[in-house]
C-alpha cells in the first residue's frame, strides 16, 4: 500500500512478531500446509497446477535401483545461530543415467551446533554419499570449517544464478519425467507443495537444496556418460536406417 515500508531483511522474517509470535505462525503453517499457508498467511495464492515446478511432473518410486552412477548430499543452511523461521535442509540424491532419485531428507530449525550434529548423523546413514555440497552462504562455510576433519567430502557450492534462475535451469529435468521421489516418505507431500508454490512459499529451502543437488551433479553426469556406448547406439541407428532404405529400393 502507499506509504508502507517493509523493514524485513530476510526470507521468512515475521512482519509483526509482537502480534503473531514465531511459535504461533509455525503451528498455523503445520496445520494449514504449504499451499494454504501461502494463500492465508502470505496472501500469495498459487494455482494448484502452475509455476516453475508443476506438481504432476514428479515421478515416484517404491524401490530404489540397486546401484547408482553416483550419490551426493546437498545442504541449505540457515542464516542465524538461533532457531528462527529459517530451515536447515539436507537431501541425498542418487543419479543413474538421465534419472535422479530423491533418497532421503532431514530438515529442521537448528542452531549451528545442532546443524553440525545433523550433518554428521546424515552422513553416516546408507546409502553413503561421497560428495556433500554446502552452499557458500549463511552458516555453510562455518559448518565446513568445523566438520572438515570429521566428515569427508564436504564441498562448497558457489551458485551462479538467483534462486529462480536455478529452479528454471533444472525444471526441464522434472518436466521430462526424470526426477523420482519416494512414494511413501512422510516429507514428500510438503516437498511437492513447496515446489509447486515456488518462489512464493514462505520457505524455499527444500527447493533450493534440490536445485543445488542437480546443478552440482551436472559435471559428474558428464563424467559418467560413456561415449563408446553413445557411438554404438548411433552406429546401430545408421544401420537400421540403411536397411530400411535398401528395403525400399528393392520394392
Where are these regions (language model features)?
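A general structural signal for well-ordered alpha-helical packing
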Residues: 38, 71, 87, 116-119
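C-terminal nuclease/phosphodiesterase catalytic domains that cleave nucleic-acid phosphodiester bonds
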Residues: 35, 39-44, 81-85, 91, ...
Amino acid at each position: 500500500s502507499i506509504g508502507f515500508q517493509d523493514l524485513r531483511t530476510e526470507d521468512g522474517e515475521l512482519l509483526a512478531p509482537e502480534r503473531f509470535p514465531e511459535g504461533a505462525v509455525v503451528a498455523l503453517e503445520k496445520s494449514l500446509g504449504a499451499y494454504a499457508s501461502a494463500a492465508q498467511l502470505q496472501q500469495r495464492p498459487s494455482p494448484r497446477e502452475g509455476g516453475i515446478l508443476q506438481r504432476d511432473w514428479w515421478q515416484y518410486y517404491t524401490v530404489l535401483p540397486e546401484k547408482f552412477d553416483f550419490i551426493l548430499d546437498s545442504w541449505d543452511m540457515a542464516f542465524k545461530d538461533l532457531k528462527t523461521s529459517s530451515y536447515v535442509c539436507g537431501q541425498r540424491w542418487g543419479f543413474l543415467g538421465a534419472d535422479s532419485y530423491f533418497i532421503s531428507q532431514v530438515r529442521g530449525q537448528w542452531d549451528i551446533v545442532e546443524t553440525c550434529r545433523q550433518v554428521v548423523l546424515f552422513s553416516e546413514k546408507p546409502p553413503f554419499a561421497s560428495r556433500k555440497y554446502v552452499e557458500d552462504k549463511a552458516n555453510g562455510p562455518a559448518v565446513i570449517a568445523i566438520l572438515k576433519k570429521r566428515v569427508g567430502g564436504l564441498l562448497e557450492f558457489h551458485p551462479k544464478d538467483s534462486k529462480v534462475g536455478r529452479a528454471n535451469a533444472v525444471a526441464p529435468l522434472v518436466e521430462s519425467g526424470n526426477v523420482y521421489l519416494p512414494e511413501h516418505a512422510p516429507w514428500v507431500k510438503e516437498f511437492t507443495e513447496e515446489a509447486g508454490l515456488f518462489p512464493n512459499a514462505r520457505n524455499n529451502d527444500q527447493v533450493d537444496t534440490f536445485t543445488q543437488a542437480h546443478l552440482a551433479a551436472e559435471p559428474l553426469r558428464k563424467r559418467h556418460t560413456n561415449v563408446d556406448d553413445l557411438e554404438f547406439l548411433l552406429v546401430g541407428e545408421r544401420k537400421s536406417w540403411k536397411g530400411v532404405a535398401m528395403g525400399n529400393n528393392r520394392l
